Amino acid sequence: MNDVVIDTNVMVYCFDNKLDLKDLLDDFFQSSFSIFIIKKCMDELVVIKKQGVKNFFLSYGVNIVDFNEGKNTDDTLLDFCMDKACMLFTEDRGLRAKANKLGVKILSFDGRAVKISNK
């Protein structure tokens, strides 16, 4: 099973570009996967006034996880990936650099497809 944690920027990108994240990940993995979203990322959508994005992803039946409430969003994402051996799907360069240093497998967009950003 492939577990993927989705960052806020990926949710907004999919919504704005009318991309179906489940279809993209299905094409990429060619096997089963689970999508996790940290509650803090969902909360960020409200702050940046992207309620439509939040509702769109809630309709996917994703796993919303309340994890490490005391830390900032990036550290929470990284901690969850390390704790659960998940891949991180993000377009945030700074977050990708931190994840790479920690050995977290990173997914990113390659046009309208998904790619592994590190090995």
Task: Give the label of every model feature segment.
Residues 6, 21-49:
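PIN/NYN-family metal-dependent endoribonuclease catalytic core
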Residues 15, 29, 103-106:
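Conserved NTP-handling cores and scaffolds of large molecular machines
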Residues 36-119:
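Nuclease catalytic cores that cleave nucleic-acid phosphodiester bonds
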Residues 1-17:
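Metal-dependent nucleic-acid phosphoesterase active-site entry motif
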Residues 11-12, 22, 78:
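Amphipathic, non-transmembrane alpha-helical secondary structure
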Residues 18-22, 73-74:
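Amphipathic coiled-coil/heptad-repeat helices and related helical stalk/stem segments
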Residues 15-20, 118:
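Short, low-complexity, intrinsically disordered N-terminal segments
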